[in-house]
Amino acid sequence: MSDETTSSPSPAPAKKKQNLGWMEWMRGWSSVFGEILFQRITASHLENPLPLPSVNDLTCVVTGSTSGIGRETARQLAEAGAHVVMAVRNTKAAQELILQWQNEWSGKGLPLNIEAMEIDLLSLDSVARFAEAFNARLGPLHVLINNAGMFAMGEAQKFSEEGYEQHMQVNHLAPALLSVLLLPSLIRGSPSRIINVNSVMHSVGFVDPDDMNVVSGRRKYSSLIGYSSSKLAQIMFSSILFKKLPLETGVSVVCLSPGVVLTNVARDLSRILQALYAVIPYFIFSPQEGCRSSLFSATDPQIPEYWETLKNDDWPVCPFISQDCRPANPSEEAHNTETAQRVWKKTLELVGLPLDAVEKLIEGENIQCRYGAQHE
């Protein structure tokens, strides 16, 4: 009888997921069209404009606030008494808006406490410099609203000056870098909030952490893939940040859908789709309607309680607020915690931050970033 033992064959390695499955894809598009067709019905209980609680002591940073949802968000927060920092690429346009708003507000109360600071989300160096300048004030930040976004529908693939696909940088990488770098100010402002204006389009998104620029050839690039992937990446990164921030910091992280809104993002649509936007106003929110979920997430007193409940329940994704200002559940792929962890690590690598950046900032330590004045 032979003494040799027969070894069992090693299991074949699991096949790497290349894209959404058909059922996931169909459920995703069902969510998209459901929001388009029924958002007015589901949000019919909301007032327009949305009444806000007292925000007199809040300092709020709103990116992309010279047009669309961001413009309405900044204006309404300022009129409600908040100190608003318009974080924008075009500071001249922001200053003109501030002057206009001050004139319109004249005689209604104290002058609006609003200012403009320059930031360009297509430049990570600009993002880091903005954070450095804001943190240098040594004041509190109570609400960061990552509102700026882009959807260059139909355009060929383009890259930022750092070499990253433009949707991924503007919609995910730059807001992620800004959120982490502003943690010192957010902790000073505790209880505080990071609000990410996301989209129901994340439901049809898929992220390959090894190919976030969609250049490997495994997937054919389209602007739709670029946009939806960036929005899913933002939720995944936010979900890990949600887990890493202890309750003691008092910093909440929320993603939201504003609904389908007639904004300057529509300027990037094809002429046919722009025409459709014009003829179906019943289905499309105005910017004033679209900003309600942003304002709700930024100011409602129940948000920190909801955030704490999800943390205590070890919920796998960060809080997500729908266009009707109710809690919602992101897509099935957004719950993929393994991919989310890889997206977290890859994002920090791409934006030039150490893997322990959040932990160090919570402890009050300094960190090194590949971008900004400190790297000169």
Swiss-Prot record:
Q: Which PANTHER family match?
A: DEHYDROGENASE_REDUCTASE SDR FAMILY MEMBER FEY, RETINOL DEHYDROGENASE
Recorded protein name is Dehydrogenase/reductase SDR family member FEY
Q: What happens when the gene is disrupted?
A: Disruption of the development of the vegetative shoot apex. Abnormal leaf positioning and impaired shoot apical meristem (SAM) maintenance, leading to the death of most plants prior to the end of vegetative development.
Q: Give an example GO molecular function.
A: oxidoreductase activity
Q: Which residues form the active site?
A: 227
- Cited function: Putative oxidoreductase. Required for vegetative shoot apex development, especially during leaf positioning and for shoot apical meristem (SAM) maintenance.
Q: Which residues carry this modification: N-acetylserine?
A: 2
This protein's source sits in the domain of life called Eukaryota
Q: What is its EC number?
A: 1.1.-.-
Binding of substrate, residues: 199
Report where it is expressed, by tissue.
Expressed in roots, stems, leaves and flowers and, at lower levels, in siliques.
Q: Which UniProt keywords apply?
A: Acetylation, NAD, NADP, Oxidoreductase
Q: What family, per the record?
A: Belongs to the short-chain dehydrogenases/reductases (SDR) family.
InterPro entries referenced in this protein's UniProt entry, alphabetically:
NAD(P)-bd_dom_sf, SDR_fam
Taxonomic lineage: Eukaryota, Viridiplantae, Streptophyta, Embryophyta, Tracheophyta
Listed GO CC annotations: endoplasmic reticulum
Database matches in Pfam families: adh_short (PF00106)
Which residues does NAD(+) bind? 61-85
What biological-process terms (Gene Ontology) are attached?
meristem maintenance; regulation of leaf development
